[in-house]
């Protein structure tokens, strides 16, 4: 009888450990912190380095009517970067071919015209069959745990909490310094 109890106890412990590993991997899979991408200079950018920071991810373009949003993005980045907030830009040429340049050309444009200092990643696709993994995460509820979304245009914003969990999708036409975004950053 003691042997049976010992075996049952061992089985229970093993099953508990297996269940815990599934729970922890499920939590990690709902976080942006699992991704590594290349920045605009080709260096590896590890989203795990953003743990403890609120994150705004935005797809950008240099020849769009919304391109002046770079100015507001940079202003809020400068104001809040030392307060556990970061913006990560992803140039994309998916809408009206409004980001035709190379990574080097995009970097020069952003620096020269808007003084961009927030992290910019290499040019990616944010929709369709070539969609990058970060945007697959951001747009699929099964991956992000919040909602399915479609990137509607350049400068759509995704807001993630300090654990890297998606909390809100913001329309491209909503300005980066909109009151609701500033309140989210500050609270």
Predicted regions and their residues:
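Positively charged n-region of N-terminal signal peptides that target proteins for export
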Residues: 1-11
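N-terminal "domain-start" segment that seeds a small globular fold
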Residues: 25-48, 68, 133
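Amphipathic alpha-helical repeat scaffolds
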Residues: 39, 59-63
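Local sequence-structure signature of Cys/Sec-based thiol-disulfide redox active-site neighborhoods
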Residues: 51-56
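Structural microenvironment flanking redox-active thiols in thiol-disulfide oxidoreductases
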Residues: 66-131
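Thiol-/selenol-based redox modules, centered on thioredoxin-like
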Residues: 133-136, 140-187
């Amino acid at each position: 009888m003691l042997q049976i109890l010992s075996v049952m106890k061992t089985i229970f412990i093993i099953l508990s450990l297996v269940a815990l590993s599934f729970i922890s991997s499920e939590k990690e899979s709902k976080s942006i912190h699992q991704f590594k991408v290349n920045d605009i200079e080709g260096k590896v950018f590890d989203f795990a380095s953003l743990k403890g920071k609120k994150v705004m991810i935005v797809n950008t373009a240099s020849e769009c009517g919304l391109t002046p949003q770079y100015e507001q993005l940079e202003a809020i980045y400068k104001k809040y970067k030392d307060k556990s907030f970061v913006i990560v830009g992803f140039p994309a040429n998916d809408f009206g071919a409004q980001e035709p340049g190379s990574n080097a050309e995009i970097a020069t444009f952003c620096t020269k015209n808007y003084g961009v200092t927030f992290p910019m990643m290499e040019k990616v696709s944010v929709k369709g069959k070539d969609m990058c993994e970060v945007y697959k995460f951001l747009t699929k509820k099964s991956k992000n745990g919040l909602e399915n979304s479609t990137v509607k245009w350049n400068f759509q914003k995704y807001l993630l909490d300090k654990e890297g969990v998606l909390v809100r999708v913001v329309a491209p036409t909503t300005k980066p310094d909109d009151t609701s975004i500033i309140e989210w950053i500050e609270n």
